[in-house]
Amino acid sequence: MGIIVSIIALLLSSSAAYAQTPLVERIRFTEYGIYTVDRDVQGRDVLGINRAAATNVRHAATLRTIPAQIGTTFGFRYEVVGRAHAAPVELRQVVIFPSPGLTPSSSSKPVRQDEFVLQARIGETSYASYTLEDAFELVPGEWVFEIWQGNRKLATQTFRVERMSNACDPCEGF
């Protein structure tokens, strides 16, 4: 009888552990465009691109065409859809730069993409972005943002960065 009770207890505990394992089904985008943020720059990564923590994130404009101006932050908010609610998940943001890539002053070769770790929770809204901070980042063309979990691509967002003329009234303040 003791063996049967032990087996039942083992089965119940393993099914409870399975039920709590996070399962990411997909990404649902909630908004995109240009944002205003307070940034705490934490230094440059090995590619020469600034790493920063963003706080006080505010959506400023829903745009796919982004002005190539220093200080412009663009990206998206998203929700991780899956189980179990509020479970933490580690994702990866890949930013693919337009050809020929970015050439930081610390590099002689163009950088074609960069990666960032995203900490998110299932069912909660998260934020991913890129801020144009240096002149070498003002590369016009298609910028592709991807969100990955392990080797599985969950989502893609595309923005077009363009040099704007001085007559770009809608771009003032960005």
Model-derived segments and spans:
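Contiguous segments within soluble domain cores/interaction surfaces
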Residues: Q20-F136, I147-W148, K153-F159, R163-C171
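A short tyrosine-centered beta-strand micro-motif
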Residues: G141-I147
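Sec/Tat signal peptide C-region and signal peptidase I cleavage site
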Residues: S15-A19
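Residue-level signal for functionally critical sites in structured catalytic/ligand-binding pockets
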Residues: G2-I3, A61-T62, P140
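Bacterial N-terminal signal peptides
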Residues: G2-S14
